[in-house]
Regions:
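ATP-dependent carboxylate/acyl-activation modules
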Residues: 43, 184-185
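Rossmann-fold dinucleotide-binding core
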Residues: 1-67
Length: 185
């Protein structure tokens, strides 16, 4: 805190649309006094703010959330490709999800985007891969095994290496589609 400066780190969760309408989720880490001084400004950016005493805790919370998103999309694309190969209409699968405890807005949004072949980015493959990689590194530094996200990381690396890094993260479906010899529509 040389020269009286205080530093905050505020990773966010949400898309560009949520940034535009001020409904991001913010994870703020750092000096508590500084946080309270600028909290009213941060409230204009998001619908909910969580304060963490350390910068690292705020960063890891964001990475934890994005690892859940990666897990959801990996499960979704796997199910859609398997279902398509078995002759199941992907829209029927999304409808079944909508009536179950498994339903989540992300699954419906990304499932529909996949079926409609709309990979316009809301969050790039390469950006989610970066967060997955940071989570794997953070977990290793803390001595926490994360075998599931390490496998998901491989899927995202394949998508990036195939040239889809600037597409929406649901474009990872193309990796499994190529291997299965089908396209989810």
């Amino acid at each position: 805190m040389q020269h009286g400066c205080r530093f905050l780190h505020a990773p966010v969760l949400g898309s560009t649309a949520q940034a535009a309408d001020g409904s991001l989720l913010l994870f703020v880490g750092g000096n508590e006094e500084a946080f309270h001084r600028v909290e009213y400004i941060l409230q204009t950016l998001g619908k909910k703010i969580w304060y963490f005493p350390s910068l690292e805790q705020a960063a890891i919370m964001k990475l934890m959330c994005n690892s859940m998103i990666a897990g959801l999309i990996a499960s979704l694309v796997q199910a859609l490709v398997l279902g398509k190969k078995a002759g199941i209409d992907p829209r029927t699968f999304l409808e079944v999800l909508s009536f179950s405890q498994l339903n989540a807005p992300t699954l419906q949004l990304k499932g529909t985007a996949i079926i409609e072949r709309n990979f316009s980015p809301r969050f790039f493959v390469e950006h989610l891969l970066k967060d997955i990689t940071l989570l794997v590194e953070a977990a290793a530094s803390l001595g926490v095994p994360v075998p599931v996200i390490e496998e998901i990381q491989k899927l995202f690396i394949e998508a990036k290496n195939s040239g889809w890094e600037k597409e929406d993260y649901c474009a990872v479906v193309k990796v499994l589609e190529q291997k299965a010899g089908i396209e989810v529509r």
